[in-house]
Regions:
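Helix-loop-beta segment of a Rossmann-like dinucleotide-binding subdomain
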Residues: 1-10, 112-115, 169, 175-177
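Alpha-helix N-cap/helix-start capping motif
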Residues: 2, 54-55, 186
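C-terminal lid/capping helical subdomain adjacent to the catalytic/cofactor pocket in oxidative enzymes
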Residues: 34, 166-213
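Hydrophobic/aromatic beta-strand patches that form the interior of the parallel beta-sheet core
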Residues: 20, 50, 172-174
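Short beta-strand to alpha-helix junction loop
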Residues: 1-10, 121-126, 183
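Helical element adjacent to the flavin cofactor pocket in flavoenzyme catalytic cores
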Residues: 1-40, 44-47
Length: 213
């Protein structure tokens, strides 16, 4: 995924994308469009805004006027550096609740579900369980070279929010895809485009509306 995203980012910047990394601490509507207040005091204006910040989208949606029961579902990762690959494809250790995925020069082990909010502190016992499960299949592997946790954006009914805000399509939502955000990214982009341009989407979006809660 890293190489793909790097290439996609380069393609977009070559086409004129302006990238700015900052925290959004406020959203306000004006006759000319939406104004976002960024950390540091800078302000950015746009006619339309897409909120697609994954597990961090709930507070942004609230600024836009919608209360959406988005929760952060914490998932854990280990990586083992390898001279030779151990697997030729992703493998699910379903009885132990994790996946093993071959990467360039390494094996990534990821899984578990923990409803622990956006707290960045890892639960060490979950990392231990992943290490223990990996060693069940590959006893020769030593301690993982890297570990981290990530936040999956989860919605109680397991459907993402792909919707205009309740005040109009000047703000459009695209989040809550759980474990399959990259998988659903292409069709989500097509649906978001339809919402932004007020054209007919390829599927009925009522089940994905922010107003269903």
């Amino acid at each position: 995924p890293g190489q793909f995203l790097t290439l996609m980012f380069k393609q977009l910047t070559d086409q004129g994308l302006h990238f700015q990394q900052a925290s959004v601490i406020g959203l306000s509507r004006h006759k000319s469009g939406i104004e976002a207040t960024l950390s540091g005091g800078n302000r950015v204006s746009a006619k339309q805004v897409i909120i697609a910040a994954g597990a961090y989208s709930r507070d942004l949606a609230r600024m836009a006027g919608d209360r959406i029961p988005l929760q952060a579902e914490r998932g854990y990762h280990l990586e083992f550096d390898l001279d030779q690959p151990l697997l030729s494809r992703p493998v699910s250790a379903s009885s132990r609740g994790f996946y093993m995925t071959p990467m360039q020069g390494r094996l990534r082990v990821a899984g578990t579900v923990e409803l622990g909010g956006l707290n960045p502190k890892a639960s060490r016992h979950r990392l231990y369980k992943l290490q223990q499960g990996t060693n069940y299949y590959f006893p020769h592997l030593k301690q993982a070279n890297r570990s981290w946790l990530g936040f999956r954006p989860s919605i109680p009914d397991s459907r993402p929010v792909i919707s205009a805000s309740k005040y109009g399509n000047d703000i459009v939502y695209a989040f809550g895809h759980g474990h399959i955000g990259m998988t659903l990214a292409p069709i989500t982009a097509e649906l978001v485009y339809a919402l932004l341009t007020s054209t007919t989407p390829p599927i009925d979006l009522n089940d994905y509306s922010a107003g269903r809660f």
